[in-house]
Amino acid sequence: MDLRLEVRALVEYIALPGIAAVLPWRWSMAVFRRLARWQWLYQPEWPGALATAKRYLAIDDEAAFARDFRLTRLIDHADLYLTWFRSRRRYLARHVEVRGTWPAAGQVLVGVFFHVGPGFWGVHSLRLAGHSSAVLAGHYSRRSMGDAYLGWYYGVARLKTLQWASGRPLIFSPGTLAKAQQELDAQHGVIGTPDVPPEITRYSQPVQLLHRPAQLPAGLIEIARRGNAQVVIYDTQVDLATGRRVLSIGAPLDPNDQALLAHVAERFETLLREQPSAFSLWSFADSYFRV
């Protein structure tokens, strides 16, 4: 065990974002904005994100990108503690602006979101709208969490909380398609992200992304087609001045539309251009373009 790595994990995953559990959100954001100036925070994550983002986008203010990346990570990690210690219904009403509406409860859907901005509040909103959904997830490893045992424990806690928030067991590979079909057959939803590395799935397909030939996983669309479930694309962005989230819910889409993955890629690109520092998977972005 490397004590320095454990201390870093304690600070980055628990102590600092945990401030949101004890302070009002307005005060927490004021603290987070000051902490985000600290270049030591979320190293080497933010330098790697900046280096990769610069290969695909024009980053005019690198210092601002780095600061906003750190701030977004603080907010995303804080959402775990807000989920534990705040009423999600009251918090959504006060701090999350919802644009659009979910399909009526009882209508089976496949939800598509991205690792751009915090992910918990879309899941909370969907659950409160009457939809229980199984989330496609991946296991955390100690290596993926900074080689720290505390980081790994945090990741496990986050997955367990996500399962509680969504209302259904998480879906891990192998057997993703079969498990997802069982959920849809039982009138539950399935939600996941199409921006994970394409090489981890057999269902990647070509798209245009950032004006380049690319590929994105199409497993969620395949799940929707097999289950004849409508597809809803949604995302959560953050006003970094106030910490207020904006949850945008798209209109239901036909899973058999041949242009559906292109539509997903278009929304993904829009988010990357609007708030590139909010994307937490820049370290994997090169894999989209290995076509």
PLM features: what roles do these ranges have?
Residues 1-113, 118-119, 155-160:
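Membrane-anchoring hydrophobic helices of lipid-metabolizing enzymes
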Residues 37, 109-110, 166-167, 206-209, ...:
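Short, contiguous strand/loop micro-motifs
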Residues 50-51, 123, 160, 221, ...:
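Short glycine-/small-residue-rich flexible loop motifs, especially phosphate/cofactor-binding loops
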Residues 82, 86, 119-121, 143-145, ...:
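Short catalytic/ligand-binding loop motif for oxyanion handling, primarily in non-cytosolic enzymes
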Residues 95-100, 166-174:
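Short acidic-hydrophobic, aromatic-tinged amphipathic segments that line or gate anion-handling sites
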Residues 98, 135-136, 249:
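Generic preference for hydrophobic
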Residues 103-105, 128, 132, 172-291:
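Non-catalytic C-terminal accessory region of glycerolipid acyltransferases
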Residues 107-172:
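Catalytic core of membrane glycerolipid acyltransferases/transacylases, capturing the structured
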